[in-house]
Amino acid sequence: MAYLHTTQSLIITLDVDASLLSQLQQLEDAGFSVVELNNAEPAILSDVMKKHPGLRLGVSNILKTDQLEAVQKAGAHFGSSPGFMPSLIQTANIYNFHYLPGVATPSEAMQAAALGCQHVRPLPATLSFCTLLNKYLPNLRLFPADVTQKEAEKLLKLDSVSAVSVLNPELQLCEIAM
């Protein structure tokens, strides 16, 4: 599986609701380039991609292989799930799709690595769990999700943490993070 690279240490995750397009415009205007949509349907994803071609868009909460295939075909740049399922990793590998499996234990992280994942989403994204993965599995790139600004600052000091994801942040947080 290809390595997911971002020069942005903060990934913004947004719920798909009536304010989505205006929020995306605000984020793009503020200089953000990587945004993750929470539970986006392929049609919504395609529409957003047409309106915001400069954004690298991902989709979170992928639970089944058909969802992964649909968002990949719709043009998502990456996807993630809240848990570990080998079938999702195997499907992502077929499409060479950037996929972040959720891992809750070192054993799940090791299994993900054995299946070809170079990056995982620690859930829960606690500092202690990410520190453990950083120490014992330093080759895995970590993308913790649903973190606060205070947690983000601490997590980003770990060598293995590539980026953190903040869910529905206030615009002020976005300005501080840049």
Identify what each model region corresponds to.
Residues Q23-L24, T65-A74, S107-G116, F129, ...:
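Catalytic cores of alpha/beta
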